[in-house]
Amino acid sequence: MMLQPGDRFFRTDRSHMQPHQEFLRVFETAGAVRHGHFELSSGLHSGTYVQCALVLQYPRYAEKLGAGLAALFSDMSIDAVISPALGGLIVGQEVARALPPAKSDTGGGTPAMFVERDASGALTLRRGFSLAPDLRLLVIEDVWTTGGSTLETIQVVEEAGGRVIGTGALIDRSGGSIDFPVPCRALIDLPIVSYIPEECPLCREGRPAVKPGSRFTRSAP
């Protein structure tokens, strides 16, 4: 996104974090914490990968995690949630479900919209979703590593005339190192070491890297 002199940046607000062991156990119970050699969607390599889809496939776990994340934003007035596909879809829906109804609610609850990648790989707002200029949006993601998808989503919203007032994720694996232009809160702080490919010790050992992220997924012809 375009940065301007004097822009204010935020890093993960740990004062809102709940003790994360209870939520981390949910991931471990579902077998969602994987160990091996992974190439992340950011291009970085890591020996640990959290596959949120494995825990979010269970509706009760998804509801619990979504409610926990939504609770971190109880001090904000939120009109709608927006997430990047695919990783943020389910958690965005569950966070929206747990949020209190907005003043404009017509009975359906807080809307959960999403952006998705077009043929060029850029995130876009499609499927008839529209953003009113005064709509207060919360960007929700599953995992932050570099924050790239979240920053891209914020840019899409701003270009469409919307206003992002905060962003959240189930897991912040960055160690709180990401600069966001809005307040940011994560349910679980789980710093995991990542490497650029040229410095990856697993590559030096000759271990092949697996690409587990949804950005690498392609539909069968």
Where are these regions (language model features)?
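PRPP-associated nucleotide enzymes
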Residues: 1-221
